[in-house]
């Protein structure tokens, strides 16, 4: 990828816009590339990149809606308001923008140039990514210009979800057809422009069939849902972790910047959205999946937990020069979005490192609250009437606020990892330092959201959990259980592979080191994993699928398919145990349902972006009776309706 992006970097600005124009087929200057001179191997990596940026942003924003992640401040910014289920239109723009302006606009020119030379594998890649991009648009926005999109029409009509869905499946078939062909002599090899699979056509075919299985499962609410068709597609989807579709990413110094959003090009796109800054936190509900602390849970801690939930230094000891000589790690506990009013009281706030002694006076009028606060204070304190005076020694981690309710916000570790573009120390040291001079670590990062984390576009583990769900729907518990166990094992194996890569690279971060094999074996044999096929539930399958998928928009897609925690899909009962709407939720004008069994009780889709409402508003308003009205956010997209 690094080589491909370096070669083509200087072309991207021109290509993204010249593909919208009609150019004369004469006097093409190779030193000044345009729509005609942009060959397939130059276009493809940029289509892949901009699709991935849209996908990474969607991963973060949908994971926030799904209650996997939240933000540090009260509901003000667009993404923070997603956590409160009180969204604004601004959250709808980046995904749309990067897919259409960076990626989709280049698909037809790529197909045209590839057709001229018989480069069938590039045609296959274009149709596969077209299916992925427009399915993402359907998943998020519902109705969308599709058949008239990218045709040059200034006001393309909208298509309904079934048209987009059928078109995406048809595009996958076209992709499979082209990948199955032998390229014409002299055609550019796919390996020269493919940043996902390195030109491995068999992996592209695995991707197409895996996507087909995913999409066929996605209509599980529809009368046309065909479990046998899902299983048939899975036969040609990834069969092991060796078949995983992964985009590698790199933490490099001097990386060029994405022109649409000003983020580094080569870093992980989910990191760009979720862990570039200090505002993101995991939630308690997600943490409880890893500790199995939910209704009916075993209480067994998952060995993947320290790889997924970040940690911060605590109990720091300094020498006379102020350098850290000893410390312990404190693991993130997750922000309880469903049961606590923490964000309604201004939290959680970011923490700081005490370069010198800091003293704070906390006025606590309520005696019980004051007593509880004193019992929890780990630092020297005095009490004067209703005021507790706490002294934070040099080297302590503290919250710069006199609000006593915020003093404990150090328990919520932010997700940030530093890259070489964001104050990073080295390509292998991605700690978030509060003070880099003394190496005061404010966060160890998370497996799926570091600058050089792999993007798992489609994984064998996901295929296993799809298979487990389908077999359970068919009443075949033994096969469902076998697939469930295989999915858990695949998740561990995949993580171990990446963790060993990080270890070999020279990282010093313990959260990037491999897990202990004995811990994995003990977990797999524990009550945290269903040991008998007869006891397997859909909730068990989905819990493990969430953990394996990480920060991924498919988590929200699945959540909608099962109506969140309504418990009214088939005989599966409550699939998302202990799940609730955010405690701070008040936006009944947007999500007006009053009962969990009502579809509009839950967050169901995104409103359209300003690109559509500003420039194609007439067609937008014709697309849905709720278009551009508040309740559109709770209107199910096509596949989410029975």
Which residues does each predicted region cover?
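Sec-dependent signal peptide recognition
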Residues: 3-10
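Bacterial Sec-type N-terminal signal peptides, specifically the leucine/valine-rich hydrophobic h-region
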Residues: 14-17
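Short, compositionally biased low-complexity segments
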Residues: 20-24, 75-81, 138-145, 504-519
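Membrane-proximal, proline-rich intrinsically disordered regions
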Residues: 20-73, 86, 231, 323-328, ...
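Structured, solvent-exposed acidic/aromatic patches
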Residues: 38, 72-466, 470-499, 534-536
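Long, intrinsically disordered, low-complexity segments
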Residues: 200-201, 214, 274-280, 287-300, ...
């Amino acid at each position: 990828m690094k080589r491909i992006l370096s070669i083509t970097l200087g072309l991207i600005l021109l290509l993204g816009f010249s593909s919208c124009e009609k150019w004369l087929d004469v006097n093409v200057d190779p030193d000044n590339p345009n729509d005609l001179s942009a060959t397939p191997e130059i276009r493809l990596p940029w289509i892949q990149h901009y699709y991935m940026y849209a996908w990474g942003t969607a991963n973060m924003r949908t994971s926030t809606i799904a209650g996997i992640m939240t933000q540090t401040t009260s509901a003000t910014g667009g993404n923070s308001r997603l956590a409160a289920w009180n969204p604004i239109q601004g959250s709808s723009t980046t995904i749309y923008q990067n897919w259409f302006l960076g990626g989709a606009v280049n698909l037809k020119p790529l197909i045209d140039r590839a057709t001229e030379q018989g480069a069938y594998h590039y045609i296959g890649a274009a149709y596969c990514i077209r299916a992925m991009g427009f399915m993402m648009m359907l998943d998020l926005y519902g109705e969308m210009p599709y058949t008239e999109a990218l045709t040059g029409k200034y006001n393309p009509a909208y298509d309904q979800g079934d048209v987009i869905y059928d078109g995406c499946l048809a595009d996958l078939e076209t992709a499979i057809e082209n990948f199955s062909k032998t390229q014409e002599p002299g055609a550019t090899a796919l390996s020269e422009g493919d940043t996902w699979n390195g030109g491995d056509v068999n992996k592209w075919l695995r991707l197409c069939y895996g996507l087909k299985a995913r999409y066929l499962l996605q209509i599980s609410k529809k009368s046309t849902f065909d479990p046998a068709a899902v299983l048939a597609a899975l036969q040609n989807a990834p069969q092991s972790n060796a078949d995983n579709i992964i985009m590698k990413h790199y933490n490099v110094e001097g990386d060029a910047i994405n022109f649409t959003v000003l983020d580094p090009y080569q870093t992980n796109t989910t990191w760009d959205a979720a862990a570039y800054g200090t505002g993101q936190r995991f939630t308690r509900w997600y943490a409880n999946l890893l500790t199995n602390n939910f209704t009916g849970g075993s209480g067994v801690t998952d060995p993947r937990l320290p790889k997924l939930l970040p940690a911060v230094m605590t109990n720091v000891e300094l020498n006379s020069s102020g350098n850290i000589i000893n410390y312990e790690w404190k693991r993130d506990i997750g922000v309880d979005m469903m049961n606590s009013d923490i964000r309604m009281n201004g939290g959680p706030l970011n923490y700081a490192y005490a370069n010198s002694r800091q003293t704070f006076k906390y006025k606590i009028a309520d005696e019980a609250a004051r007593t509880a606060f004193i019992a929890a204070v780990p630092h020297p304190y005095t009490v004067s009437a209703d005021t507790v005076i706490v002294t934070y020694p040099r080297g302590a981690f503290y919250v710069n606020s006199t609000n006593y309710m915020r003093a404990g916000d150090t328990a919520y570790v932010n997700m940030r990892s530093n890259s070489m573009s964001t104050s990073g120390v080295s390509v292998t040291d991605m700690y978030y330092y509060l003070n880099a001079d003394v190496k005061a670590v404010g966060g160890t990062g998370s497996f799926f959201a570091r600058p050089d984390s792999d993007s798992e576009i489609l994984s064998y583990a996901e295929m296993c959990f799809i298979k487990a769900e389908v077999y359970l729907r068919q009443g075949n518990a033994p096969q469902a259980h076998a697939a469930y166990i295989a999915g858990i094992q695949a998740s561990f194996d995949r993580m171990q592979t990446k963790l060993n890569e990080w270890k070999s690279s020279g990282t010093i971060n313990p959260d990037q080191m491999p897990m202990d094999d004995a811990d994995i074996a003990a977990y797999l044999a524990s009550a945290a994993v269903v040991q008998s096929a007869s006891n397997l539930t859909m909730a068990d399958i989905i819990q493990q699928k969430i953990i394996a998928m990480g920060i991924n928009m498919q988590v929200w897609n699945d959540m909608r398919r099962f109506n969140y925690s309504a418990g009214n899909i088939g005989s599966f009962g409550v699939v998302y145990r202990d799940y609730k709407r955010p405690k701070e939720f008040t936006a009944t004008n947007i999500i007006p349902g009053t009962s969990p069994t009502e579809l509009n009780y839950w967050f169901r889709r995104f409103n359209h972006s300003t690109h559509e409402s500003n420039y194609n508003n007439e067609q937008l308003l014709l697309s849905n009776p709720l278009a551009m009205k508040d309740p559109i956010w709770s209107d199910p997209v096509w596949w989410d309706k029975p």
